[in-house]
UniProtKB/Swiss-Prot annotation:
Gene source species: Wigglesworthia glossinidia brevipalpis
Pfam families in UniProt: ATP-synt_ab (PF00006), ATP-synt_ab_N (PF02874), ATP-synt_VA_C (PF22919)
Role, per record: Produces ATP from ADP in the presence of a proton gradient across the membrane. The catalytic sites are hosted primarily by the beta subunits.
Protein name stated in the entry: ATP synthase subunit beta
GO molecular function, one term: proton-transporting ATP synthase activity, rotational mechanism
């Protein structure tokens, strides 16, 4: 018989006893029917004697020992394809936007193997984001993996929202957003922002917010990835956004503790690298289409050496590091140009001009950072004339790296700006060469391209 009964309940961990010949496989979905609703759980361990240990995908309220459990003989499957666009679903693929059932003809299991070595395709093509500091210092590759690293409140979600808006409007591609263990309010704001930007019909949303059980939060990234894989397999270039990878790790830690595994460093699960690898290896481009992944990664206590962000680093092509120090100066996006890196910043990929301008910008900002202590102790007048000019240009560069976002217009009061890569390179090159040494640094703050700076200068300073 493909039915068992509950023998133990410990929070979201349920032990179910089956006849030994009918024991379900790992990752199979089991169903409990209770009070006109269905609860789904996933098999995590086979602990012997016909007993399997499962993790619930919902609340355990109302469960009791002896309840009948049905083996579905397959893993969790979710609807995929174009009917999911503009819709919000949960980890099980059920709609949570009160717009009725998602009418998809195809369902896919959330547990899939990553593409074989022969199917994988790589590309050096750049993905223009319209955000100056990203396009210049840490350019994104089409089909690459990008991490947005930052502590609490430095702008990871806002940067992600701007990226979705820019790429959906300027490149008209499909996006999939997985909200993993984040605030419900943020999910609501995000949904409304997508509607107001008129890009909601190009985005599929999968939410498993922080009040959900750990099993739900652990699997919601896989649900989103399954949707993205379908779009990729149809020949599309897809953007896959995950907010937040740290919560995915945290859910794994909770599940690991509930299953009785001995924790490793700093309390993380011993299977941290494996779980991260299973997710990240599926986020890849094939000969039919590409998945470009942007992942927000919370950094506990701003410590980049913490095992969770450190494990994620190895999978990424570009790292965008958000700095609390830069945010405190009022410069947004608060991206650190000295810490952020990209494998694409290579003269053979981006071109000689782009590469030289980016490296020159970094060297000027690094020199300014080194001089800050001298300026603080002795004052700027004690510097050589050459260093005084360098400091002046560095401060202009710092302010020119700020940019008004479309999704943050309500907060900044500035109209959003999309800046092309050519305008970005030309603008920074002209500052390096001293063409605008006569313009005060305030004119460079919260502007788009260099013509915006000149307009601001004429309006306020001439």
């Amino acid at each position: 018989m493909d039915t068992g009964k509950i023998v133990q309940i410990i929070g979201p961990v349920i032990d179910v006893k089956f006849e030994i010949s009918f024991i379900p496989k790992i990752n199979f979905a089991l169903e409990i029917k209770i009070k006109n609703k269905k609860l789904i759980m996933e098999v995590m361990q086979q602990i012997g004697d016909g007993i399997v240990r499962c993790i619930l995908m919902g609340s355990s309220d109302g469960l009791k020992r002896g309840l009948k459990v049905f083996n579905l003989n397959k893993g969790i499957e979710v609807p995929v394809g174009k009917p999911t666009l503009g819709r919000i679903m949960n980890v099980l693929g059920d709609p949570i936007d009160r717009k009725g059932k998602i009418l998809s003809s195809e369902y896919r299991p959330i547990h899939n193997k990553s593409p074989s070595y022969n199917e994988i395709s790589s590309s050096d093509e750049l993905l223009e984001t319209g955000i100056k500091i990203i396009d210049l210092i840490c350019p994104f590759a089409k089909g690459g993996k990008i991490g947005l690293f930052g502590g609490a409140g430095v702008g990871k979600t806002v940067n992600m929202m701007e990226l979705i808006r820019n790429i959906a409007i300027e490149h008209s591609g499909y996006s999939v957003f997985s909200g993993v263990g984040e605030r419900t309010r943020e999910g609501n704001d995000f949904y409304n922002e997508m509607i107001s930007s008129n890009v909601i019909d190009k985005v599929s949303l999968v939410y498993g917010q922080m009040n959900e059980p750990p099993g739900n939060r652990l699997r919601v990234a896989l649900t989103g990835l399954t949707l993205a894989e379908k779009f990729r397999d149809e020949g599309n270039d897809v953007l896959f956004f995950v907010d937040n990878i740290y919560r995915y790790t945290l859910a794994g830690t909770e599940v690991s503790a509930l299953l009785g595994r001995i924790p490793s460093a700093v309390g993380y699960q011993p299977t941290l690298s494996e779980e991260m690898g299973i997710l990240q290896e599926r986020i890849t481009s094939t000969k039919s289409g590409s998945i470009t992944s942007v992942q927000a990664i919370y950094v506990p206590a701003d410590d980049l050496t913490d095992p969770s962000p450190a494990t994620t680093f190895v999978h990424l092509d570009a790292t965008v590091v958000l700095s609390r120090q830069i945010a405190s100066l009022g410069i947004y996006p608060a991206i650190d140009p000295l810490d952020s890196t990209s494998r694409q910043l290579d003269p053979l990929i981006v071109g000689e001009d782009h590469y030289l301008v980016a490296r020159k910008i970094q060297s000027i900002l690094q020199r300014y950072k080194d001089l800050k202590d001298i300026i603080a102790i002795l004052g700027i007048d004690e510097l050589s004339e050459e260093d005084k000019i360098l400091v002046s240009r560095a401060r202009k560069i710092q302010r020119f790296l700020s940019q008004p976002f479309f999704v943050a217009e309500i907060f900044t009061g500035f109209s959003g700006k999309y800046v092309t890569l050519k305008d970005t390179i030309d603008g920074f090159n002209s500052i390096i060469n001293g063409e605008y040494d006569y313009i005060p640094e305030q004119a460079f703050y919260m502007t788009g391209n260099i013509s915006d700076v000149l307009d601001k200068y004429k309006k306020f300073y001439s």
